[in-house]
């Protein structure tokens, strides 16, 4: 570790595709407390290209070589979900602190094993549930804790995203439910995690998980591929606080209406709206206290923004907020949310929702 910064190595740092060029690279570039120190891709030529593009001193085409040779404070696993488990296991076995994209594993068992090993080795962990670092949700959580709308009675979450019918060849691998990158785990997982962050965890849940579009058109090849991955999730549940919850998240063909999260309390209402996924896009917060005729937009206090103004808006912003938090944790040897334990809790909820859908029974948590 440098005097004022942590050294980060990223596995999955390609220039042309993936999450690194869209979020991590532009985020870290503007973070004074985080140094992009090493890249690893699956091929030597792409690793060198990434190092040159990002201005990173070390390039590797084998992650084990990077783990053995690079002087790092944390390793980030930023690859497709099916590779999370293998790579994260190797990082943990090497004794490195770790950041892994969400979902932590392709299933609950993988998440349990990764969380157990991280605890056994006493390593610091973070998972890319970036809504937990988003200023709007941090502020919303605090408003709820301060009883801004009194006792929360119920909440409703809706998210509809377009484009389920057709995908480029690089994304049709997500058709297989076993690979773990589905509407249930990713869009729903991110959105329900933000809800739980603000309102608390579920005591019980009933779910309906289904695939409404059983074939995708693969662009460029012009072929149709069979799909087992779910695209529509509907749940009803009760939080440990007693609040009633309903949620409906779908990947639909056309004209998705975006995201809307409504919270109803004894003294008023809070609403979050977004045209995009709230974890990566811009959102607005509205409030309606008892006696008001209309909802009024709330400005998010600047104290919730922890990163420089030069960090780009969109996906890089909340990722930068996470890196700021993780840097603080590494420097102080303190684990902050969202950790592997946070991710494991979310995996357990997702598993319960799937079990409820499969069996037609309410699941207790």
Per-region residue spans from a language model:
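N-terminal Rossmann-like dinucleotide-binding module
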Residues: 1-54
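Beta-loop-alpha module in the N-terminal Rossmann-like domain of NAD(P)-dependent dehydrogenases
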Residues: 45, 54-117, 321
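Contiguous beta-strand/loop segments that form the cofactor/metal-binding neighborhood of enzyme cores
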Residues: 192-284, 320-328, 332
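Predominantly a Rossmann-like dinucleotide-binding segment in NAD(P)-dependent oxidoreductases
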Residues: 17-19, 131-226, 360
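Hydrophobic residues in well-ordered beta-strands that form the structural core
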Residues: 10, 60, 100, 125-127, ...
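Rossmann-fold dehydrogenase core element
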Residues: 113-130, 150-155
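C-terminal helix-rich "cap/oligomerization" subdomain common to oxidoreductases
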Residues: 1-5, 29, 74-76, 112, ...
